[in-house]
UniProtKB/Swiss-Prot annotation:
Keyword Coiled coil: yes
Protein known as: Charged multivesicular body protein 2a homolog 1
Region of interest called Disordered, as start-end residue ranges on this chain: 1-32
Subcellular location per the Swiss-Prot or TrEMBL entry: Endosome membrane
Function summary: Probable core component of the endosomal sorting required for transport complex III (ESCRT-III) which is involved in multivesicular bodies (MVBs) formation and sorting of endosomal cargo proteins into MVBs. MVBs contain intraluminal vesicles (ILVs) that are generated by invagination and scission from the limiting membrane of the endosome and are delivered to lysosomes enabling degradation of membrane proteins.
Family: Belongs to the SNF7 family.
Keyword Transport listed: yes
Coiled-coil segments on the chain, per record: 12-80, 114-148
Known partners and oligomeric status: Probable core component of the endosomal sorting required for transport complex III (ESCRT-III). ESCRT-III components are thought to multimerize to form a flat lattice on the perimeter membrane of the endosome.
């Protein structure tokens, strides 16, 4: 509480007010420096006029005033530089304060979450998850092995079928040839030739 019953300003509000006052002071100094530059040019012009008129004593006094004026301008420039540095420092302090507040909020949130987390239950959940994952992997491996066995059996059946056909063809070719006239029907010769061609094609595909 302040002396007048108002609420006390927070550090953020005080920093904001300080920065506003510093900016106001810099603007006022800029205006004063611009005014003194005009006065400086007037002094230089008067000194030249007095020197041309031979009024050296007056020119000397005016030159002394010019030196003092320039000294005042230099001091104002130095003060302005200081104000600028203070303003920058204030901005840095405000940024650091904002970052500190954010870190404090994050720390508080993390602390709350840690308090609410049941480590024992979390460990049980992770163990159950790992167990179920292993079961799924084992099932996938078993299914893959079954598919591989089926493919192997199918390929073996194909090879065996081709070998049997080859043996049958070989035995057929070793049989003594029979004259056409000894066959009861001439259509049997055509049938044997067709089967012979199909067997040859099958053997070539092996």
């Amino acid at each position: 509480m302040s002396f007048f019953g108002g609420n006390k300003k927070t550090p953020e509000q005080e920093l904001k007010d300080s920065k506003r006052e510093l900016s106001k002071g810099q603007r006022e100094m800029d205006r004063e420096l611009n005014r003194l530059k005009i006065v400086e040019q007037e002094y230089i012009g008067k000194i030249k006029q007095l020197a041309k008129a031979g009024r050296n004593d007056e020119a000397k006094r005016m030159a002394n005033d010019l030196v003092k004026l320039r000294g005042q301008m230099e001091r104002m420039r130095a003060t302005k530089t200081t104000l600028s540095a203070v303003s920058t420092k204030t901005t840095t302090i405000k940024a650091n304060q904002t970052m500190a507040n954010a870190m404090a909020s994050a720390t508080k949130a993390m602390s709350t979450m840690n308090k609410q987390t049941d480590l024992v239950q979390l460990q049980k959940t992770m163990m159950e998850y790992e167990k179920q994952t292993q079961r799924v992997e084992m099932t996938e491996e078993m299914m893959q092995d079954m598919f591989e066995d089926d493919e192997v059996d199918e390929e073996a059946d194909d090879i065996l079928s081709k070998v049997v056909d080859e043996v049958c063809l070989d035995n057929y070719q070793k049989m003594p040839s029979v004259a056409q006239k000894d066959l009861p029907y001439s259509s049997k010769t055509s049938t044997f030739k067709t089967e012979d061609e199909e067997l040859n094609k099958l053997l070539q595909s092996l």
